[in-house]
A protein has these predicted regions:
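Intrinsically disordered, low-complexity, mixed-charge
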Residues: 2-113
Length: 113
């Protein structure tokens, strides 16, 4: 599990630890904390996933955080995290990222209620 105080730390860690040319699927459970509910965070995540081969869901949690369960190729998952960082960094106070076994899902990234 990675515990970071900002997306830049997570993105750098992923790029360092994952081979960006690795064609294997990666799956991450990401908890975003901060001012992440009521600001379009989930919709931004889905919009930023367009054009990437990533699958999973993003949803609000009862504790005020947002959970994203995403999987796809290494480069696409890292790119999605980077895109979210670029647009939402002012809202993110901290994140927890836990790498999991891929489930080979399809259907893109969707909002789960």
């Amino acid at each position: 599990m990675f515990k970071c105080v900002g997306m830049r730390d997570v993105t750098r860690t992923l790029i360092r630890d994952w081979n960006a040319c690795d064609l294997m699927n990666k799956r991450c459970i990401v908890h975003y904390r901060g001012r992440v509910q009521g600001v379009g965070f989930r919709f931004t995540a889905v919009r930023q996933s367009k054009g990437l081969s990533v699958h999973g869901y993003v949803k609000n949690e009862s504790d005020g955080s947002v959970l994203m369960d995403v999987e796809g190729g290494t480069a696409d998952v890292a790119e999605l995290l980077r895109r979210i960082e670029m647009e939402m960094s002012g809202n993110i106070d901290s994140i927890n990222l836990d790498e999991r076994q891929p489930q080979n899902r399809d259907g893109g990234l969707v909002i789960r209620y």
